[in-house]
Amino acid sequence: MLEVVHIQKKRGKKQVLNDISFQVNCGECVAIVGRNGCGKSTLLQIMAGVLKPDQGEIRYFGKDARKDRKVVREYCGYVPQENPLMEELTVKDNLRLWAGTSREIERNVIEQFQLDELMKEQVAKLSGGMKRRLGIACAMLRWPPILLMDEPTTALDIYYKDSVWQWIQQYREKNGMVVITTHDEREIMGADRCLIMQDGVLTELEKNEITMENIRQMMDRLNEKGGNK
């Protein structure tokens, strides 16, 4: 189980995250939605151990992720919105770095994200969509039980969006936990729960409330209002 417990975070005088608490169970996908700049990425960075909260805890299977970086490395795969890759290296070298070993790279990950013909290519020469696929593949090499994805299908065409989402479903079937930030209606519809972030606070839609009509009304309301950065 992934637990987010009373997380608070300020940027300057702005309260970006205000007493955020929720949990994610094995095999569950949770979508976090909100306007650009509302704090979604900040929350994922805290959950991934990249950023420290002012208050609160992140627990992976009961272990406090803030106190032990080994817990984060063992349990969490993180796909940030910004490109985390080593641009000067090849695709294969990036995969090896993220795997933390020079052993043979998992073939199923390479095949799933169609990287076979790109292994010797320098990352700097890849398109934005190819880099995105590689970033997701890197996060998945160790098949972590927790996967945090910030706008995972950004820069992908419809074919690869569908491919990534199919893969997420397979991952969930094997009891993986997924938290995504997204503006994509189909991704929201495919989630078990939807958390709406506004003014530093989360409200939740249950599965039976996640309808296309509710999502569009929700997005329209969010687009009418500003959010924290």
Role assignments for model-derived ranges:
Residues 48:
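Helix-to-loop junction immediately C-terminal to a conserved catalytic motif
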